[in-house]
């Protein structure tokens, strides 16, 4: 015999086909009748030749003990002197061989062995590979390697076809099948086990086509291009470790008493070994016949078919309908029994697995088939390990106990068969219950693969009933609903409540205006007082009663995506609102309530606990502590969290540019009224300044201390005042400077408020009320203005680079000059603006301070001298760049003070209109280049315009010659410099060239 390439080829006689003969036909005739054990030693010599034992054919001569002992002795002697590392010494005991005597094999077929009539999948052991000892031990089970079978080496023990065997000794009466089949298998179960091994499982695409019979793992998106290949395992010794002992086959004596265990054993078999078959046979051998208890299985070729027959489909449909009909009558014992067994019954892979089931277990099997995937294209993936099954069972039982049931996968008893998702494409629909009458199944627990939710009536006061919507685009192999969130299924209300408890706020796309500035008041308009934040104190009932929508019509606040100012923001309504909320008789913030469209800023700084830095008196109450706030920092901190509960500004759906303009456009220089203090008549203007700006401590955010957006005194000052702080002058009946282009109100509301508190006056794009009261001294206004605007000068590039008067600021967005705002081109008619110095009694020192502040750092050409130029109002009327007779050009050597400049004022020539105005004012009340207008307004004198035009022409002629001379001088200097540059550049070039050569 030729040696093989395999290292272990000498262990087996590959060219001699061993097969077992009938166990009862021939025995090894031994004197003792016992074979305690044997040893097989294989030795290869140093030359690499494999020494094999030839099998000698003897005519039915039994082997005797002397020959066996002699062969064993020779083998032992050879193994002692073996120097090869490849020697293999296998010692096995034949204790199990007593159950079935070993049969001898004869070499009668050209050195081979005739076909055996015994089982071909039994383990075969050759004793010294001799004819006397070549016996088969059928009780040792399957082979550890594939080489022990007569099949070609490329075949496996699973390829053995039991039907071609002539004799089937395991069918003989009184024979223990465990002697022929391991792990409690029988003939049919072994066939079912061997068939699908190594078959490729196709992963189908699409979603929601089926419900897996046991989906114990997280759902994953299937990849249609992936093919799962189940490898064929050769290590059969691992199987007893992974298989529980109770998965033994049920013998014929126990078949009548334990029908349920059939499916149980079948589950363990198929779940552990992962056999994806559609039809399984569970049964055992009867005593006197080769038939099995229960229904007979389908033919072998149909056992593992991937598609079910039409009759099977009809049967499955009937079973589903029966399971739904019996679902309402299910007793708790069935649920308990189902949960106690875990998913063992659900893992039964086929509808025919209910063989041998009597009447007692009909309902039990119906439950097991209820959740199994029995559609026409069902595929069963490899089930998880036993540990995963146990873990999932424990988790499911615990979840069921927490929610009031034993098992979380209790069927949806309130749904009929037409609404159950049975795993087919035809069932992929929306299940909606939009009937106006209450659902009789409401209040029951609805189960799914992911958890439970309670469809309770208490969550729906008068709203529509719950809607279970099937989302075709979300689910991948399992059920998904639109309300699914945070790992469980919720209704809309439960979902939002869960988010409220988890995050502390609601993100439901509803504007703050619609729900009364309460972020928790999403679905209940007339809700009771609820905490806005931990420090909230304002009452929402007034706003809720004024809300202009219904919950049923606008549940999610779609009507409030856009800002709509309806009855709520009328002036009269605002006035009543102030009286009710604050207990006062006067209108405190008419400007903010009707003018500013930011919905949540009205109550932003209200707090239960009064600030520690605020000024308190007897009338001070905690609710009114933070009412008047500096709104400062909105332009710098525009993207900070607008609400104390952390909701971003975007949630209120206010456009960014509108909010930016709102914050930058209102800055008043008067004092605001505060309810906690005594009335304004009891204070002088200076006292009001000291008493009313108590909230300078709010000028910086200190959220790291208390988590709220407050500001402190030693921070940078506010670039803009509070949007609700109006200029407080004399009962708030005057001195309101508005900007209609930034005022998002209707003209009717604006006129209504002005007619109520102000004098009627013409208005245009940049509204200036010419008819306002004149009882307030400009002195006090400028005093406060200078004090508030001064710290902010460093933050704006105002008019320092422009030629303008002290009060004429071209930058319309400056927060402190709302009193005099003009368009950028400065060409504004005179009647549209108002002179800032037209009031009596302001001090000259205030003018000096403002003058110095506005022009301190203005450096122009002229040997380092400060050039101060002021345009008069005639220049604004159209003669830009001209210095009128009321203006002057003055150079100071840097040391001149403002007082020295003012000494020259009386010597300045004045126009007719200024001379007329000087009769009504003190001489110290004037500033150079200023037009003093009377109350009714002064039109520009045509005579003065002509005079100014003539002077402008003279000035041009005077500087014309100077300009030409300067240009000529500059041109000559430029030519000389250019010649020198050319001369200086030529020499180095020639030198470099010479050096380079």
Curated annotation (Swiss-Prot):
Disulfide bonds: none annotated. Residues 261-272, 534-547 have a biased composition (Polar residues). It is found in: Nucleus. Residues 309-323, 334-346, 367-379, 388-404 have a biased composition (Basic and acidic residues). Residues 250-272, 289-475, 534-553, 880-900 are annotated as: Disordered. GO terms for molecular function: RNA binding. Residues 930-963 form a coiled coil. Its main location: nucleus. Keywords: Coiled coil, mRNA processing, Nucleus, RNA-binding. One of its GO terms (biological process) is mRNA processing. Pfam families: Fip1. The keyword Nucleus applies. GO terms for cellular component: nucleus. A motif (Nuclear localization signal) lies at residues 397-404. Component of the cleavage and polyadenylation specificity factor (CPSF) complex. Forms a complex with cleavage and polyadenylation specificity factor (CPSF) subunits CLPS5, FIPS5, PAPS4, PCFS1, CSTF64 and CPSF30. Component of the cleavage and polyadenylation specificity factor (CPSF) complex that plays a key role in pre-mRNA 3'-end formation, recognizing the AAUAAA signal sequence and interacting with poly(A) polymerase and other factors to bring about cleavage and poly(A) addition. FIP1L1 contributes to poly(A) site recognition and stimulates poly(A) addition. Binds to U-rich RNA sequence elements surrounding the poly(A) site. May act to tether poly(A) polymerase to the CPSF complex. Belongs to the FIP1 family. This is FIP1[III]-like protein. It comes from Arabidopsis thaliana (Mouse-ear cress). The gene is FIPS3.
């Amino acid at each position: 015999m030729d040696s093989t390439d395999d290292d272990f080829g000498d262990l087996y006689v590959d060219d001699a086909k061993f097969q077992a003969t009938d166990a009862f036909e021939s025995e090894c005739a031994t004197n003792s009748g016992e074979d305690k054990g044997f040893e097989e030693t294989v030795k290869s010599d140093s030359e690499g030749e494999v020494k094999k034992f030839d099998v000698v054919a003897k005519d039915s001569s039994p082997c005797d003990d002397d020959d066996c002992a002699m062969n064993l002795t020779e083998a032992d002697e050879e193994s002692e002197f073996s120097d090869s590392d490849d020697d293999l010494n296998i010692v096995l005991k034949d204790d199990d061989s007593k159950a079935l005597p070993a049969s001898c094999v004869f070499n009668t077929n050209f050195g081979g062995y005739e076909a055996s009539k015994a089982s071909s999948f039994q383990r075969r052991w050759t004793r010294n590979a001799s004819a006397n000892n070549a016996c088969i031990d059928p009780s040792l089970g399957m082979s550890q390697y594939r080489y022990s079978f007569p099949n070609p080496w490329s075949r496996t023990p699973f390829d053995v076809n039991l039907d071609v065997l002539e004799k089937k000794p395991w069918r003989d009466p009184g024979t223990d099948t465990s002697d022929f089949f391991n792990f409690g298998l029988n003939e049919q179960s072994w066939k079912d086990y061997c068939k699908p091994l190594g078959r490729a499982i196709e992963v189908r695409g699409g979603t929601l086509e089926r419900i897996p019979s046991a989906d114990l793992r997280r759902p994953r998106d299937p990849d249609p291009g992936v093919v799962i290949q189940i490898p064929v395992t050769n290590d059969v010794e691992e199987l007893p470790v992974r298989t529980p002992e109770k998965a033994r086959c049920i013998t014929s004596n126990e078949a009548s008493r334990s029908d349920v265990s059939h499916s149980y054993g079948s589950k363990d078999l198929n779940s552990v070994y992962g056999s994806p078959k559609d039809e399984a046979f569970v049964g055992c051998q009867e005593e006197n016949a080769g038939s099995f208890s229960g229904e007979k299985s389908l033919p072998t070729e149909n056992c593992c078919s991937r598609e079910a027959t039409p009759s099977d489909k009809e049967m499955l449909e009937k079973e589903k309908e029966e399971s739904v009909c019996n679902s309402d009558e299910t007793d708790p014992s069935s649920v308990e029994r189902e949960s106690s067994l875990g998913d063992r019954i659900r893992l039964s892979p086929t509808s025919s697995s209910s063989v041998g089931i009597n009447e007692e277990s009909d309902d039990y099997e119906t439950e097991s088939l209820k959740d199994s995937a029995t559609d026409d294209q069902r595929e069963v993936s490899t089930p998880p390990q036993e540990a995963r099954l146990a873990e999932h069972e424990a988790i499911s039982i615990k979840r069921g106990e927490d929610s009031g049931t034993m098992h979380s996968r209790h069927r949806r008893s309130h749904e009929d068969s037409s609404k159950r998702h049975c795993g087919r494409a035809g069932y992929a629909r929306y299940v909606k219950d939009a009937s106006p009458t209450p659902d009789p199944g409401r209040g029951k627990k609805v189960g799914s693969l992911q958890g439970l939710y309670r469809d309770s009536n208490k969550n729906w006061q008068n709203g529509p009933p719950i809607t279970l919507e099937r989302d075709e685009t979300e689910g991948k192999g399992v059920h998904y609903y639109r309300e699914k969130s945070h790992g469980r299924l919720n209704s809309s209300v439960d979902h939002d409540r869960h988010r409220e408890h988890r995050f502390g706020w609601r993100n439901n796309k509803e504007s703050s205006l619609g729900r009364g500035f309460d972020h928790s008041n999403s679905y209940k308009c007339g809700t009771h007082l609820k905490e806005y934040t931990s420090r909230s104190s304002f009452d929402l009932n007034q706003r809720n009663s004024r809300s202009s929508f219904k919950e049923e019509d606008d549940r999610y606040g779609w009507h409030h995506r856009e800002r709509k100012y309806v009855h709520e923001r009328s002036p009269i309504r605002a006035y009543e609102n102030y009286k009710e909320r604050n207990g006062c008789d006067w209108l405190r913030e008419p400007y903010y309530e009707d003018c500013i469209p930011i919905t949540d800023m009205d109550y932003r700084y209200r707090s239960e606990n009064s600030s520690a830095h605020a000024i308190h008196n007897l009338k001070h109450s905690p609710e009114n502590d933070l009412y008047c706030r500096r709104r400062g920092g909105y332009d710098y901190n525009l993207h900070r969290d607008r609400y104390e509960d952390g909701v971003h500004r975007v949630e209120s759906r206010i456009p960014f540019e509108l909010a930016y303009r709102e914050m930058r456009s209102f800055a008043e220089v008067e004092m605001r009224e505060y309810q906690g203090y005594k009335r304004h008549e009891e204070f002088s203007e200076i006292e009001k300044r000291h008493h009313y700006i108590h909230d300078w401590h709010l000028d910086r955010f200190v959220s790291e201390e208390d988590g709220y957006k407050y500001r402190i005194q030693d921070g940078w000052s506010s670039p803009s005042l509070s949007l609700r702080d109006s200029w407080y002058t004399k009962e708030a009946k005057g001195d309101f400077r508005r900007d209609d282009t930034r005022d998002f109100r209707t003209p009717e509301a604006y006129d209504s408020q002005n007619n109520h508190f102000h004098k009627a006056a013409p208005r245009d794009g940049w509204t200036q009320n010419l008819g306002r009261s004149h009882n307030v001294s400009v002195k006090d206004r400028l005093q406060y203005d200078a004090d508030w605007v001064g710290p902010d000068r460093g933050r704006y590039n105002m008019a320092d680079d422009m030629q303008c008067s002290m009060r004429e600021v071209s930058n319309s967005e400056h927060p402190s000059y709302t009193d005099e705002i003009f368009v950028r081109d400065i060409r504004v008619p005179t009647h549209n603006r108002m002179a800032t110095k037209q009031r009596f009694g302001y001090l000259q020192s205030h003018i000096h301070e403002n003058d110095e502040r506005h022009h301190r750092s203005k450096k122009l050409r002229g040997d380092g001298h400060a050039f101060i130029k002021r345009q008069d109002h005639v220049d604004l009327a159209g003669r830009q760049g001209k210095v009128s007779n009321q203006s002057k050009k003055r150079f100071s050597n840097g040391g001149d003070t403002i007082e020295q400049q003012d000494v020259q004022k009386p010597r300045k020539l004045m126009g007719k209109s200024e001379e007329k105005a000087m009769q009504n004012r003190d001489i110290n009340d004037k500033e150079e280049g200023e037009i003093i207008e009377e109350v009714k307004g002064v039109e520009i004198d045509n005579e003065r315009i002509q005079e100014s035009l003539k002077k402008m022409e003279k000035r041009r002629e005077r500087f014309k010659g100077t300009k030409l001379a300067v240009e000529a001088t500059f041109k000559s200097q430029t030519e000389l410099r250019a010649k020198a540059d050319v001369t200086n550049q030529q020499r180095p070039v020639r030198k470099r060239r010479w050096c380079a050569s």
